[in-house]
UniProtKB/Swiss-Prot annotation:
It comes from Bacillus subtilis (strain 168). The gene is ykoJ. InterPro entries: PepSY. This is Uncharacterized protein YkoJ. It holds the Pfam family PepSY. The lineage of its organism: Bacteria, Bacillati, Bacillota, Bacilli, Bacillales. Residues 1-26 form the signal peptide. Induction: Up-regulated under secretion stress conditions in a CssR/CssS-dependent manner. Overexpression of ykoJ is lethal to B.subtilis.
Length: 170
């Protein structure tokens, strides 16, 4: 009987020691993994350099963001008067998109053609006009000062010339 109690005590002690050892190893391993992922993480400067290989222009802003469920740096680059967003994966250090290629595939009408479409709807003078990308779709945003003195804002699809929005301001 004394031998059984001694064995149960020894077994309980071994299990407790093993549990403590496993917990210490798991904590240390997790700390090492976190430290290595921090040293492997992409810096803003690296993200900027990678993004500029996709769109060569002036970097205006860099923010951490999510893109298609991945942690990225969103690098906003201005080139020839237009803004482009390049998404660089923080872990793989790869550019995930090519906005110049996307634009070429999606922009079928010129800014002048979009302005003509808007001017047919309301006469006047175009006071502001620019191509903008919104959630992967390219649109022309413009403002027209009418002959009656009101301002009309338009959003026109760059792919097919469809009027997406027309708003009259008093």
């Amino acid at each position: 009987m004394l031998k059984k109690k001694w064995m149960v005590g020894l077994l309980a002690g071994c299990l407790a020691a093993g549990g403590f050892s496993y917990n210490a190893f798991a904590t240390e391993n997790n700390e090492n993994r976190q430290a290595s992922s921090k040293t492997d993480a992409l810096t803003e400067q690296e993200a900027e350099a990678i993004a500029k290989t996709v769109v060569d222009g002036t970097v205006e802003d860099i923010d951490r963001d999510l893109y298609n469920g991945k942690e990225v740096y969103e690098v906003e680059i201005e080139k020839e008067g237009e803004d482009y967003d390049v998404y660089v994966d923080i872990h793989t250090k790869q550019a995930l998109n090519d906005p110049l290629k996307e634009k070429a595939e999606q922009v079928a009408i010129t800014k002048e053609e979009a302005e003509e479409i808007a001017l047919k709807q309301t006469g006047g003078t175009v006071t502001e006009s620019k191509l903008d990308e919104d959630d992967g779709a390219y649109i022309y945003e413009m403002e027209i000062q009418t002959k009656q003195g009101t301002e009309t804002e338009f959003e026109i699809s760059a792919k097919d010339g469809r009027i997406i929005k027309q708003e009259i301001d008093d």
